[in-house]
A protein has these predicted regions:
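Signature of Gram-negative chaperone-usher
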Residues: 1-146
Length: 146
């Protein structure tokens, strides 16, 4: 199916750091099966750094990077709301990507100050290599700014 599946995580940060914090995320790999098949990063494996609207994988036979992809979005107002209304990036598996930031103390519950949602979308085409064990480990790091 070429329809995206979406899963989200709620991030909560409580800090008394006067200049706030930044939360980054990094995947240890792209989604990889036990057969070493992969679901590449958004968009068609190009690792989009600039947020853009979700696009389905193109599914070009013989071009494995186009068989499926996954990307991330954040509802935080980070960098002037760079993720806008569900814009996605794919550059979070080879380096860390900032997904949440606030410039002052945070209470762990107020939207865009102490709490936000990060979501991951994944879609595959009929050419994606079969497997039910595609995995990647996401590591979040919250860094205070003093």
């Amino acid at each position: 199916s070429a329809n995206a599946n979406v899963a989200g995580q709620r991030l909560n940060v409580t800090t008394n750091a006067s200049n706030g914090f930044t939360v980054t995320v990094q995947a240890d790999q792209t989604l990889t099966s036990s057969n070493n098949d992969t679901i590449d990063v958004f968009d068609d494996g190009d690792g989009a750094a600039a947020p853009k609207a979700w696009e389905q994988p193109t599914g070009t036979f013989g071009s494995v990077n186009t068989y499926g992809h996954w990307g991330l979005t954040s509802d935080d107002d980070i960098n002037g709301s760079e993720f806008g209304s569900a814009l996605f990036v794919g550059n979070f598996s080879t380096s860390s990507r900032a997904v949440f930031h606030h410039s002052g103390p945070a209470n762990g519950s107020t939207d865009n100050i102490g709490s936000t949602t990060v979501a991951y979308a994944a879609a595959v085409t009929a050419f994606q290599e079969a497997g039910d064990d595609y995995t990647a480990t996401l590591t979040y790091v919250a860094t205070p700014v003093f």
